[in-house]
Amino acid sequence: MSSKLTDRQQQVLDCIRECLKDNGMAPTRAEIADIMGFQSKNAASDHLRALERKGYIKLHSDRSRGIQLLDHAYWGEEELPVVGKVAAGIPIEAIENVERTVPVPQGLFKQRPTYLLKVQGDSMVDAGIFDGDLIAVRKSNVARSGEIVVARIDEEVTVKTLKLNKSSATLLPANEAYEPIKVPADQLIIEGIFVGLIRDPNSF
């Protein structure tokens, strides 16, 4: 992940994004200075060099509009809360308070997540979800059969693939070493739907 930006650097980055979106080309240093209310182009240049050092843009000195937004900078980033831990195996009690936040590029997932949950256990490895992963979750109290969900059972939470029947629900692991969890439909609470994952940078 790139270094955190100051408020002013974020404003300059937003200015570049908007110019690319509206005009199809990056602004000049003079245009940035004018839009941002800087006294000179030098102030714009200072912020641009800082953005380059932090990995958001690449400057091309041989071009008049030589500002290239790197992919994650084009979409921007947002801080998503890590709100607890989910056992991918044996359900554990949810931790409701926010442990920390993690910067995630906007547009990384097809559906925008609400929060991240940390996986403990290996019951979903065949679905590509490993111990220590941060799963991106879209908050929802409904889900379709076949979706990977965060489910609450008796005030404990787990992540599994949901299979719905007429009067019951089955939470399916993605590891043959674990048994499916079958519960009455009226005792199952859906907390959210899995929309993707990122490897937790704090796990390495």
UniProtKB/Swiss-Prot annotation:
What is catalysed by this protein? Answer: Hydrolysis of Ala-|-Gly bond in repressor LexA
Q: What class of enzyme is it?
A: hydrolase
Give the Gene Ontology MF terms in alphabetical order.
DNA binding; serine-type endopeptidase activity
**Where are the residues marked Cleavage as a site?**
88-89
Q: What is its EC number?
A: 3.4.21.88
DNA-binding region at which residues?
29-49
Q: Which UniProt keywords apply?
A: Autocatalytic cleavage, DNA damage, DNA repair, DNA replication, DNA-binding, Hydrolase, Repressor, SOS response, Transcription, Transcription regulation
A Pfam family matched in the record: Peptidase_S24
- Recorded superkingdom: Bacteria
Q: Which HAMAP family match?
A: LexA (MF_00015)
Q: What does this protein do?
A: Represses a number of genes involved in the response to DNA damage (SOS response), including recA and lexA. In the presence of single-stranded DNA, RecA interacts with LexA causing an autocatalytic cleavage which disrupts the DNA-binding part of LexA, leading to derepression of the SOS regulon and eventually DNA repair.
Quaternary structure, from the entry: Homodimer.
Q: What is this protein called?
A: LexA repressor
Lineage, broadest ranks: Bacteria, Pseudomonadati, Pseudomonadota, Gammaproteobacteria, Oceanospirillales
